Amino acid sequence: MIKTLAKNIKGFVKESVLTPFFMILEVIVETIIPFLMSSMIDDGINKGDMQHILITGGYMGALALTGLFAGMMGGIYGAKASAGFARNLRRSMFANIQSFSFANIDRYSTAGLVTRMTTDVTNLQNAYQMLLRMCFRAPVSLICAMAMTFIINARLACIYLIATILLSVVLAFIMNATYKYFSQVFEKYDELNASVQENVTSIRVVKAFVREKHEVGKFRKAADNVYRLFVKAENAMVTVSPIMMVTSYASIILVSWFGANMIVSSELTTGELTSMLTYCMNILMNLLMVAMVFVMLTMSLASGKRVAGVLNEKSTLANPENPVYEVKDGSIEFDNVSFSYNTKAEKPILNDINLKIKSGETIGIIGGTGSSKTSLVNLIARLYDVTEGSVKVGGKDVRDYDIETLRDKVSVVLQSNVLFSGTILDNLRWGNENATEEECVNACKLACADAFIESFPDKYNTKIEQGGTNVSGGQKQRLCIARALLKNPKILILDDSTSAVDTATDASIRKAFSENIPDTTKLIISQRVSSVSHADKIIVMDDGEISAVGTHEELIKNSPIYNEIYVAQTSGNGDFDAKGEL
């Protein structure tokens, strides 16, 4: 974990070195001042030597200014180093997340990743700043002060040594006891963020069903879980301060008592006792700093483990050593393919799939909910890797291609249509960042999106709100189809991507595809028979297997599942899911 996180110090090594340097300089200054103060009292004030007082006072003043400067510089460099460390962590995490396959993404919740990028990184930032400043300052100051007390009087110094050892043992015990609580706290933060995210993104549904009270209750429960665990952790940590105070006062009383007796017996001077008490406060303050560092490190250990987990996550998909950089054509072949999202699953999602599709063919895919239609097409763009068998595109196994090359030629319009903040043109150019406005317009005409775009006052410069909330479901689908077309793909996959458009528009899109992109292999997943009836071949999926393959006419005669869907839809009962699901 530490090695993974330490890589993100790059670019801020100078600041990370200068911070402890200035902190140690400040410690050295603070250690010398009480020693000079002892000399001022014994050799200056007690003897009435004004010259000694002025010279020693001048040295103390100069050292105080040096300590002030060192402390300020340490704070400045520490803040810069920790902020840079946090920035690098977020950049590294975000870049690694972008490389994740769908299988990697499935392991983390969206809220969990958000918590890691925000709360956990902030904890690490604070811990790193404290590490640079306190973790160097406190131990060095503690050792220096302890050494000076032994130089002044070894017997009195033993009181500090015993107190330090006892406090160290107690702090180690408390840190070990609270670590598990902070680990659980950050897991509950994931649930809290998930509750907020789900509510904000689905606020229209919440309002439509008048479920505000239910959502408030759900959020309150998540917030209470965080509260309870945090209180448990803090209940353990809160004992640190009282223990520190008791130890501090006990040490001061003991040193004062024994020191006074030593002064009476001429074993100790007044100046030496004053220095001992000053060093006592120095030692105890540094122990308090160490306690604060322990608290922060306890919290950051849990955060560090979570962040390092994301940084160390390797994509389940990787380019081969000598990848293929050209997709010959849009032909597709499934050869004895089986697939599971979970390798430990008893039954595969797809089982023994064998299928050949010629380049330029239009293929319809139909079947009931959960029949694995989407899982089938996800393998073509290598969004997932097969468990058994192979998938070939252009005569080559998809695992032999450079992933970027393959996905550039296999354009997928997913079930969940996503638009980003920006103009319509900005969204379209996700398909091809170098596309001209004319190319964007042509793609929109093919997707039957040009007409409604032209009706907007700003036309193609119309701003899309976050999530595309200012366009209808059908308009959003057509924009996503146009975006996919701008890639000039050899394979176009429409995963139920016209479900929100009317049948006339659906037919117009199909006609435009047939006339304008005849060489592109088109796979159309749909619940509507009318959307796939024109296809060269229709694949009927049932429970992860291919139930039947054929033309519309052939399947009406030979496939009970397809015939049932067709009859249900043409008889006016609406869209029909296989196996009698309406």
Predicted regions and their residues:
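ABC-type nucleotide-binding domain
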Residues: 325-582
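Alpha-helical membrane-protein architecture signal
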Residues: 2, 6, 14-18, 90, ...
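Membrane-integrated ABC transporters
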Residues: 1-33, 37, 45-59, 73-78, ...
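Transmembrane helices of ABC transporter permease
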Residues: 11, 15-28, 63, 69, ...
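Helix-loop-helix
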Residues: 49-55, 148-162, 175, 232-306, ...
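An intracellular "coupling" helix at the cytosolic face of ABC transporter transmembrane type-1 domains
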Residues: 11, 99-103, 119-132, 136, ...
